[in-house]
């Protein structure tokens, strides 16, 4: 659906490349995350998809079209197929909720009856039918983002671009908006590109993710692989921030390891079985259970002492548990 072929972008002012040699593909119907720190090039990347920016080198192909080669009419048609939602909502303050949602339909010259019916349908989908006559100033942040989503869907796009769509929201509202986005992907088959600086957002809704650092893709793959086995320093930093950077507390001895359980292994009593079999004692330094979309996984950070620690690590691994050494000898 979307392909970047060795894309670079350098702005005239400053001359520093915002993107350098970016190549990636987004499959039709998937939720693709792009994560990076501020200034990594995320917003530039997403603006290249709908032609708000043009590449300095390389090609951006969207639904079969070379975006940079499109004329005015072609870009207008592309933007009807590519909806976008923003961090700060970008609503028209002088128009009601219904008028904001109807705006792109009116610009497209749709008949009044169609505009009215489509607007009502979209407001129902995002749960705002009762707020159709309100103005943006009367809405909460989450409600404003729902209006933005409804407006982005007005022209039945194939692609939805989400530029930091939850970063201005509180945690509970973020969960609700992510649930809505995931539902749109499931129910409408939308291809979604989600820009964020939060690994927790990626884990919650994305199928695959690209990690950007200083304008370059430093890692790309399935969310499960990148989250549980990050290969780049940048990805490891984001995972630590999402999980909590647990290291040995002062005075804690032994070998400190992180155990990662995935799928059904998450709920099995592996820890007790290994401790009994090997005589190893353990102190729990941290732990949590989460989901990568629908797949449960758990992580425990332990200090292992006494007994046969090497045998304990081998037994964990034989049970399908990943073991990462955080201090002491390296686990295999």
Swiss-Prot record:
Q: What class of enzyme is it?
A: translocase
Question: Which transformation does this protein catalyse, written as a reaction?
Answer: L-methionine(out) + ATP + H2O = L-methionine(in) + ADP + phosphate + H(+); D-methionine(out) + ATP + H2O = D-methionine(in) + ADP + phosphate + H(+)
Which InterPro entries does this entry report, sorted A to Z? AAA+_ATPase, ABC_transporter-like_ATP-bd, ABC_transporter-like_CS, ACT-like_dom_sf, MetN_ABC, MetN_ABC_transporter-like, NIL_domain, P-loop_NTPase
Per the record, membrane topology reads: Peripheral membrane protein
| Domain named ABC transporter: residues | 2-239
- List its EC numbers: 7.4.2.11
Instruction: Write down the SMART domains for this protein, in alphabetical order.
Output: AAA, NIL
Instruction: Give one Pfam family.
Output: NIL
Keyword set includes Cell inner membrane: yes
Alphabetical keyword list: Amino-acid transport, ATP-binding, Cell inner membrane, Cell membrane, Membrane, Nucleotide-binding, Translocase, Transport
- GO terms of molecular function: ABC-type D-methionine transporter activity; ATP binding; ATP hydrolysis activity
Tell me where it resides. Answer: Cell inner membrane
Xref: PROSITE patterns: ABC_TRANSPORTER_1 (PS00211), ABC_TRANSPORTER_2 (PS50893), METN (PS51264)
What does the entry list as the binding residues for ATP?
36-43
Q: Which GO terms describe its cellular component?
A: plasma membrane
Report the sequence similarity comment from the record: Belongs to the ABC transporter superfamily. Methionine importer (TC 3.A.1.24) family.
Q: How does it assemble?
A: The complex is composed of two ATP-binding proteins (MetN), two transmembrane proteins (MetI) and a solute-binding protein (MetQ).
What is this protein's function per UniProt?
A: Part of the ABC transporter complex MetNIQ involved in methionine import. Responsible for energy coupling to the transport system.
Q: Which protein are we looking at?
A: Methionine import ATP-binding protein MetN
Species of origin reads: Caulobacter vibrioides (strain ATCC 19089 / CIP 103742 / CB 15)
């Amino acid at each position: 659906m979307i392909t970047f072929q060795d894309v670079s972008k350098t702005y005239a002012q400053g001359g520093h490349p915002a993107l350098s040699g970016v190549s990636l593909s987004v499959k039709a119907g998937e939720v693709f995350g792009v994560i990076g720190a501020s200034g990594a090039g995320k917003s530039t990347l997403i603006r290249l998809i709908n032609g708000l920016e043009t590449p300095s080198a390389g090609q951006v192909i969207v639904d079969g079209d070379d975006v940079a080669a499109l004329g005015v009419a072609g870009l207008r048609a592309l933007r009807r197929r590519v909806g976008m939602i923003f961090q700060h909502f970008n609503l028209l303050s002088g128009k009601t909720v219904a008028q904001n949602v109807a705006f792109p339909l009116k610009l497209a010259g749709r008949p009044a009856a169609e505009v009215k019916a489509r607007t009502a349908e979209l407001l129902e989908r995002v749960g705002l039918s009762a707020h159709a006559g309100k103005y943006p100033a009367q809405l909460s942040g989450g409600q404003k983002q729902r209006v933005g989503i409804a407006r982005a869907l007005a022209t039945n796009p194939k692609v939805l671009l989400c530029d930091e769509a939850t970063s201005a929201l509180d945690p509970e509202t973020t969960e609700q908006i992510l649930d809505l986005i995931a539902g749109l992907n499931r129910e409408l088959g939308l291809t979604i590109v989600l820009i964020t600086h939060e690994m927790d957002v990626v884990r919650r809704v994305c199928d695959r993710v690209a990690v950007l650092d200083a304008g370059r893709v430093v890692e790309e793959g399935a969310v499960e692989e990148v989250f549980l086995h990050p290969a780049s320093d940048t990805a490891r930093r984001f995972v630590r921030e999402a999980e909590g950077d647990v290291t040995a507390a002062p005075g804690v001895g032994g070998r400190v390891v992180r155990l990662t359980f995935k799928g059904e292994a998450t709920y099995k009593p592996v820890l007790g079985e290994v401790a009994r079999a090997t005589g190893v004692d353990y102190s729990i330094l941290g732990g949590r259970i989460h989901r990568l979309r629908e797949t449960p996984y758990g992580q425990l950070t332990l200090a292992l002492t006494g007994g046969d620690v090497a045998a304990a690590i081998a037994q964990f691994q034989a049970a399908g548990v990943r073991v990462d050494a955080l201090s002491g000898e390296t686990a295999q």
